[in-house]
Design a protein with these regions (language model features):
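Glycine-rich phosphate-binding loops of nucleotide-dependent enzymes
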Residues: 1-235
Length: 235
């Protein structure tokens, strides 16, 4: 579904992504793991149009998107859950969901999907008119996911969705991600929590200092002694 080919991305003179290549297969969860500063978020931002790479290609279903704007990428069916949740704090829960559907015109379908979000995230249903900035961290993360889903994506990019959450909420977030995938959604999941991410993923990409160090099935990475010692706390 997504193919990354020899991608190079910069922040000014800082070479953040150094010729990475990998694929995200349709219908699967691909986990992008690595330490802070490895290049995971930069990769996600490059795919969703927030950062334009200097070299290389990003192919969505065979078509290049690396020069497209973020709103153009959304219209192609790519949803984005940013690091740190980034909900609109002075808007209500309901208004945040409306923002997620801004590019859609069928009001009946939007209303249907909004109700689906409240069924999926019952915590939000009780806070429809509450300002997003007053929600707990876990509730804000649920809202960020629901907002991205309101764009009706075929591919969901998730940047550190477990960051800053209590262990019980982390488990809940990973269960939600796995459930979305079971419904057919393709997901690229950027995570420092390698153990949790690989547990639900089909494939994994390990990044270090802007490069791909390992790429394999999630199970193979979980069984790799180097990965176990460096990222899974084994050995």
């Amino acid at each position: 579904m997504i193919a990354i080919e020899n991608l190079h991305a910069y922040y000014g003179n800082i070479h953040a992504i150094k010729g990475i290549s990998f694929q995200v297969r349709k219908g699967e969860i691909t986990a992008l793991i690595g330490a802070n500063g490895a290049g995971k978020s930069t990769t996600i931002k490059s795919i969703c149009g927030l950062l334009h790479p200097r070299e290389g290609k990003i192919l969505l279903n065979g078509s290049p998107i690396q020069r497209m704007s973020a709103d153009q990428v959304v219209h192609l069916g790519v949803g984005y859950v940013p690091e740190g949740r980034r909900v609109f704090p002075v808007l209500t829960v309901d208004e945040n969901l409306d923002m997620g559907a801004y590019g859609r015109s069928n009001r009946a379908e939007i209303a249907r999907d909004r109700e689906k979000m409240y069924e999926m995230f019952p915590q939000l249903k009780n806070r429809v008119k509450q300002l997003a900035g007053s929600l707990s961290g876990g509730e804000q993360q649920m809202l960020a996911i629901a907002r991205a889903l309101m764009s009706s994506p075929q591919l969901l990019l998730m940047d550190e969705p477990s960051l800053g959450l209590a262990p019980l909420l982390v488990k809940q977030v990973f269960e939600i991600i796995a459930g979305l995938n079971r419904e057919g959604l393709t997901i690229l999941l950027s995570e420092q929590n390698a153990r949790g991410a690989l547990k639900i993923a089909h494939h994994g990409i390990v990044m270090e200092t802007g490069k791909v160090r390992f790429a394999d099935t999630a199970r193979a990475l979980q069984e790799n002694p180097v990965i176990q010692q460096a990222y899974l706390g084994v050995g």
